[in-house]
């Protein structure tokens, strides 16, 4: 049965992501002041794609606070991200953060007998911030 038959839509409640017709969630973001887009990746869950978008948005726009409504999961971000990092480093950090979230969902779903992804996101929100660091992806001359 198609999701359109059940009344569900492929539109997400998260910012900066979309769903492909075959079910994967993707995220990309425009680099401010340019026509360039950063491809952040293809993810199994909407939450993974949303976290990737959040990391890239934060690195590119450097908002003054994490209370900005531009974020999907502001509580998962760390404010200790470096400034002046390359778009490629931002892309890698965002993609890895999204994949880490996806991996957490797959572990929670497969280990719990098929519980809903939303409940695993609730568990994730109770844990500490993402353990991934943008510093892991900085080019040596920027550190």
Curated annotation (Swiss-Prot):
GO terms for biological process, alphabetical: ethylene-activated signaling pathway
Example of a GO cellular component annotation carried by this entry: nucleus
SUPFAM superfamilies, sorted: DNA-binding domain
DNA-binding region: 13-74
Keywords recorded for this protein, A-Z: Activator, DNA-binding, Ethylene signaling pathway, Nucleus, Transcription, Transcription regulation
Family: Belongs to the AP2/ERF transcription factor family. ERF subfamily.
Protein name: Ethylene-responsive transcription factor ERF020
């Amino acid at each position: 049965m198609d999701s359109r038959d059940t009344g569900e839509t492929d539109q997400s409640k998260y910012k900066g992501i979309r769903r492909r017709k075959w079910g994967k969630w993707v995220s990309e973001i425009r680099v401010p002041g340019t026509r360039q887009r950063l491809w952040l990746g293809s993810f199994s869950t909407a939450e993974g794609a949303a976290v990737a978008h959040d990391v890239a948005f934060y690195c590119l726009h450097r908002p003054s606070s994490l209370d900005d409504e531009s974020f999907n999961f502001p509580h998962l971000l760390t404010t200790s991200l470096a400034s002046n990092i390359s778009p490629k480093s931002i892309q890698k950090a965002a993609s890895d953060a999204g994949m880490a979230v996806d991996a957490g969902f797959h572990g929670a779903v497969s280990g719990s007998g098929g519980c809903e992804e939303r409940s695993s996101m609730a568990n994730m929100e109770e844990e500490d911030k993402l353990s991934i660091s943008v510093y892991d992806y900085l080019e040596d001359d920027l550190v």
